[in-house]
From Swiss-Prot:
The active site is at 96 (o-(5'-phospho-dna)-tyrosine intermediate). Homodimer. Heterotetramer of two Top6A and two Top6B chains. Relaxes both positive and negative superturns and exhibits a strong decatenase activity. Belongs to the TOP6A family. HAMAP family: Top6A. The lineage of its organism: Archaea, Methanobacteriati, Methanobacteriota, Methanomada group, Methanobacteria. Residues 2-138 form the Topo IIA-type catalytic domain. Keywords: ATP-binding, DNA-binding, Isomerase, Magnesium, Metal-binding, Nucleotide-binding, Topoisomerase. This is Type 2 DNA topoisomerase 6 subunit A. Its EC number is 5.6.2.2. Its cofactor is Mg(2+). Mg(2+) binds at residues 186, 238.
Length: 353
């Protein structure tokens, strides 16, 4: 079966569970894996967060849970119709469509949670169920050709902003590529700098502009090119706790998405910088750490994803110097410096480890 058929069957199975309970004279109920913090575990072998084995039960015998079950079934039926017709809807559209249901949502946050409940219950991503986020995927520039339906797209000939990653990235086929690595950067300012300086050619690389915190489609794209095309992934973000976090979500996933991290995380991705050591070694322009930065850095030290010596050293060093720096701070030495000097030195150091 293809992905569409699997999704339809799983969505139907949710209704079958209810019908079977009714037929057997039982109170209808649905088992939903718990997404509470006590059931979210960092798996040292997989190197990302996973869900534990705890489940919750939603029962129509509980008056407080009847509406939640109804919302879940209405949403599942809506998704089944979307997938069957090969259509998609945004999470915002789902919220407004529910206005016509007998069990509508109080706000979009409530509808988003039900979408996540479907994900974790069925073991499929919301994108596979036809539900799309509002945010754009990353921009990609480099020698990669993809096929979306019957359309082939060359990421070198898609304009200066490159190919925009589709929300339905699992339906995209990688046709051809002539690159040796992926360089993902946090800001679009740095993305355009690397494109202008032809970093894609100099480093035989796909340049990925993350646009801040990487969207799910972006993380899925990065994982796919890493695993399917065997391309090493390098991440270059701002040198602050937020840049560290953006990189780590790509590498080891997030606790919130523990149920789908196996499809989104790229544990072998490497963080190039900007590190606290870079701030010192390259004498970069800096800003002082704010109180919120210090608090966040101390939180990262307690996070199991940052247990490695590299991360501990860099986080502690940043706390010691009390400074942070942006990617664009390399412009102190000229616009070309980041491509001519910084990236070659960092790539050589990381690739020779």
């Amino acid at each position: 079966m293809n992905r569409r058929e699997i999704a339809i069957n799983k969505l139907k199975s949710l209704g079958d569970v209810i019908l079977d309970d009714v037929t057997q004279g039982r109170i209808p109920r649905i088992k939903v894996p718990s997404r509470g913090t006590s059931n979210i575990i960092y798996d040292e072998d997989k190197r990302h967060y996973v869900l534990g084995d705890r489940y919750g039960t939603r029962s129509m015998g509980n008056v407080k849970q009847i509406k939640k079950i109804g919302q879940m079934l209405y949403t599942a039926n809506f998704c089944k119709d979307l997938v069957a017709r090969e259509k998609t809807a945004t999470l915002r559209e789902l919220y407004y469509i529910s206005e016509g249901w007998e069990v509508d949502f109080a706000d979009q946050q409530e509808s988003n949670i039900v979408g996540e409940d479907l994900e974790v219950t069925l073991g499929m991503t919301r994108e596979e169920l036809g539900l799309m986020p509002e945010e754009d995927g990353a921009s990609v520039y480099g020698a990669l050709t993809v096929r979306e339906g019957d359309i082939e797209i060359d990421a070198l000939r898609s304009g200066k902003s490159g190919y925009n990653i589709s929300p339905t990235i699992d339906e995209v086929e990688f046709v051809d590529h002539d690159v040796e690595r992926v360089i993902a950067v946090e800001t679009m300012g740095m993305f355009h700098r690397l494109v202008q300086e032809k970093a894609y050619k100099k480093f035989d690389a796909l340049i990925v502009g993350l646009k801040g915190q990487a969207a799910r489609a972006t993380r899925r794209f990065i994982k796919r090119v890493n695993e399917e095309l065997n391309l090493p992934v390098y991440i270059c973000n701002d040198g602050d706790p937020w840049g560290f976090h953006i990189a780590m979500v790509i590498i080891s996933g997030s606790a919130k998405l523990a149920h789908v991290n196996h499809q989104l995380a790229t544990p072998d991705a490497k963080f190039l910088g900007v590190t606290a050591s870079d701030i010192i070694n390259y004498d970069l322009p800096t800003d002082p750490l704010k109180d919120v930065d210090v608090v966040r850095l101390k939180e990262l030290l307690q996070d199991p994803r940052y247990r490695g010596d590299f991360w501990k050293t860099e986080i502690k060093k940043m706390l010691t110097i009390g400074k942070k720096a942006e990617q664009q701070s390399f412009s102190k030495y000229g616009l070309e410096y980041v491509v001519d000097t910084y990236l070659p030195e960092k790539l050589e150091a990381v690739e020779n480890q």
